[in-house]
Amino acid sequence: MKPESNFKLKALIVGIDGEDKGFSINNLLTLAYIEDIKSASVQMHISLTDTVDGILSELSGMEPVYIEFEDNEGNNFNQNLMVYDIQGRVLQGSKSKGTLVCCSPDLINNASTKVSRRFGTGGGKTIDKIVKEDILEGLLETSRDIDARATKNTFSFISPYWSPFTMINYLASKSIPKEGGTKNASSGYAFYENADGYNFRAYDSFCDDTFKYKCIVGYEEPAEEKPDPQIIAVDAINIVENGDILMGLNIGSFNSKVMTFDMKDMGYKEYDFNIHKYYKSVPKLNGDVTLPKYFEKFKKNTVPTRIMSKVVDTALYTEGTFTKDLTKQLSQSSLREKLFYNKKVEIEFTGNILPRVGEIVELTTYRGKDRNLDTANSGIYVIGRIHREYVSSNDRMTTKMTLFTDSAGDVQATSQTLDNSAEDIVK
């Protein structure tokens, strides 16, 4: 028996020359929707065919698109987008097909907006308010929801004809979280868009979230029971990156030194970094884990594996709080970002369309014939990328999810292994 489709197209409307043109499921060849925690805009690729009036030949870009679909559980997805490219267009008689490459309308506005002005006048302004009120709502005039987490530090700077998203990425490395972290909270924010809107939040803040979904490798739903919407059944995981040691040595992730020269007062300072001191103090997704043995080789007095020099001019941003330690903040935020993406895992499944980039999941996987918990790869992860794809030939939507974790060691258990035996939940 053919499995039930988990994709139902509710609406697909493209504005062409001021008129709305509706497309049905019969016109849809493929659809790919992408969210990325490193990107300020969602993307969608829509491949269409038209055998009636060849309307696709009239597309030239900048057409508004509204799409709405749901899965077999009634979970709804809808988005307003803008066409910025048409690829693979084929015209043959009355038939036409092509792929509409779409993004958020704000991304188009961002590319056409370049601003030179001072932000945070009068002694500085908290960075979260600059991002939300001055840039996203003020410059872009976005209608999207904005989750801008509070920052501890105020800031003032001059934008040298930057686009709005460039400004936000510039400010992200200088932002220190106000709440939700610890006294050792690190500077460094992530800025991204998901289906719910814009997000500007500290890397540390992800550690405060509880997991929303359980990704279990080899899971089979018990017979005659209603499916648990929190559980995502996964056949296998692909460990893409697992803390490249050689790269870590080259970029100074374990032991490094930064030497700075400030044009403002000709001041010279050195900042030392050691993974032992930093790793123990920074909030992490999996809390205290058993670190790999090679970490012992990078003790406090180890010679730096990378020495970096930097010339700065703090006269450009002397207003606000915490600006006197700006160079230290920049170095710290860079290291926090690298730690955040320390390990990369990919999974694929068919089903729930609700997971969003930035949400927390718990991954449980097993090893060996005895199906013991794989402590090296199980644990808490953040969803870093989502790629959903519908193909008309199989009438199914699959989801590829990229997960990241900042924990370099082994976990002791997951909620699933505490609540159930491996024999009860896996094949």
What residues fall within each predicted segment?
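Short conserved beta-strand and strand-loop elements enriched in small hydrophobics
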Residues: A11-G15, E63-N72, G358-R371
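Solvent-exposed coil/turn segments that connect beta secondary-structure elements
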Residues: T49-T51, E70-N72, M82-V90, C103-I108, ...
